[in-house]
Structures are given as structure tokens and as C-alpha cells.
């Protein structure tokens, strides 16, 4: 009996995603025993400050990667939007699963849409990307930092601290909370984080046995889209310090990639898009990034 150990964060959403991967692996590999190794990460523990202030989304990975290096786990499951653009050696992503809903969700107990929010409404989100698009759509809103897992954020809304909050649709759907979605915020008017809605499995690239076990879960069409989005972000030197959005979709045999850079302070948004080959997602990402630079993205990013 072969056993595969999956390192995972302890949040309900992370555990759901890891169990989803585990179930798929058991289906593909009858006889494979898959166990979860839940771990706490610095990103989960430091909830009093924004991610940008404490070092970025890579904080969600480091402890899981250390567990793999120490031989305590064979792989780790992540929301791909939390994975840095460049992985440290020897880590690789053998599997990116079929993408879930990439859109954002406005969640409110009183108001059915972004437009329905009253003047000066209090909206919770710590994402600079979401803040920039909220400021562009509704400059009057009071935007307030909001950290914690999905259930924690919903509890803060329900306790009256906010008129609305913005979360990822995929997270709510995976936790059976789709009924909490008041309005979808989606492309082309509203762009998600690069790779939002996609789950990735990480392992050591020097472990061929584990790599081959995981690679059967890879969804090629999803990988092409999210690699184009991440290539654009990489070309912009983006991180959670920077309000960057990207969304790629298949059109015929190729991809259509939309990108955005914004200002969370005043709501200025710069958009660019391009069609390209799914065989060269890096080139497509760089082309959209260059389109953003041509429209003044470098100056906007320099102000952050």
C-alpha cells in the first residue's frame, strides 16, 4: 500500500480543497492511501495586518514547503492565486485542477448589488485589487481591511461591522455557502486575481514518483489560462502589494487575456488585452503586460 501525505492549511476552505484533491487521487489510483497533514501558516496566524504589510501570500506556502523538505509531507495543495509567481527550487506544480468560478462575490445582508449600496457604505476587503475596482465603481465607499478565513469574514459581516464584503465566488461555493452571494462581480467589467478559482498541487521536482502520481490531475485548458495570467503578473513584477488583475479564456483554438493594473487609493484603472496562442502563454502574458506599460502602468505602479 502506497501512502501519499498532503500538507494543507487548517482553514475549512483549504481542507475542502485538499480533500477534493485526495478524492481525485484515490479515484485515479485505486489502492493509494491519501492522508492530510493539516498545518498552520504565518499567513493564517497574522490576521491583524494586511497581507501586503506582512510579506505577501507566500506566507501561506512556506511552512508547507518546509514540511516537504523535512520529509513530513509529499505534496501540498494551494489556491493558485496564493502561490508566488516564481517557486523556490526544487518545487514545481505537477497538477493544476480544472478551474472553479473565477469571479468575485459581493456579500451583503441588506443590499443586492454594488450599485444598491448607500453612499459611504462600509465594505470589507484587504485585497488591493478589489479595493482599486471598488474605488473606480464607487468612490464614495468606505473600504475597510478584512482578514481571516471565509467563515470568519462572514461572521464579521453578520455582526454588523460592514454593509458588504467582497469574497471569491469559488470559496463560497466550495463551502456550500453560494446562497450568501448577493451579486457576482465578473469579467469583463470586473477582473479577478490571476489564477483565481484554480487549485494547484505542489511537490518536489526531484521526486519523480510523487510527480507522476499527481500529474494525472492536471487540466491542460485551465493550466493554459492561468499560466497566461501569471505570466502577465510576472512581467509586471506583481504581488499582493500591487493591484493587478488578469483573466484568460479560450476563444476557438487560442486564448484571450484581459489584464488590469489599478490604484487602491484613487480608483484609477488601466486595462489591456490580447489574443494569443495557448502554446506560448508566456508571450501572451508579456504582450498584455507591455500593453499596460504602454498606457502608463509603470508610473501608476511606481506611486504605490
Curated annotation (Swiss-Prot):
The modification S-(dipyrrolylmethanemethyl)cysteine is found at residue 240. One of its GO terms (molecular function) is hydroxymethylbilane synthase activity. Its EC number is 2.5.1.61. Keywords: Porphyrin biosynthesis, Transferase. It catalyses: 4 porphobilinogen + H2O = hydroxymethylbilane + 4 NH4(+). Belongs to the HMBS family. This is Porphobilinogen deaminase. It comes from Xanthomonas euvesicatoria pv. vesicatoria (strain 85-10) (Xanthomonas campestris pv. vesicatoria).
